[in-house]
């Protein structure tokens, strides 16, 4: 940030403005609506995308699978990672680890609409030595056996785009 004189049609104001644009990253597909909202604020930002999804097993458990990523260098840049739901925190941590293959950010902001206590604790544990700030709309107390936040809002990707085939 730097102080800069901003001229408007009605006057001049001294304001703090970004020195450089952040990289706005999201987890495909559920994160796209929140990502688009972030781009309304940071309309000159670079974009990063990672596909991280739950691969379910017959025993009811699941692993987080990362199959695709596209990112500019994030070396010494501000990274803003957005995903509407922070349930277990696993996909956010794996996404972060995938992105830092393109450099280490100066600072990371993690933005979620709803998080679980378990997800927040998981981030704190697994991103212990990283510089990050959490921005959360709400923190709910419970995860179901299927790792959905209660009361939460359901599957954010399905709500935005319809059920998966």
Where are these regions (language model features)?
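PRPP-associated nucleotide enzymes
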Residues: 1-165
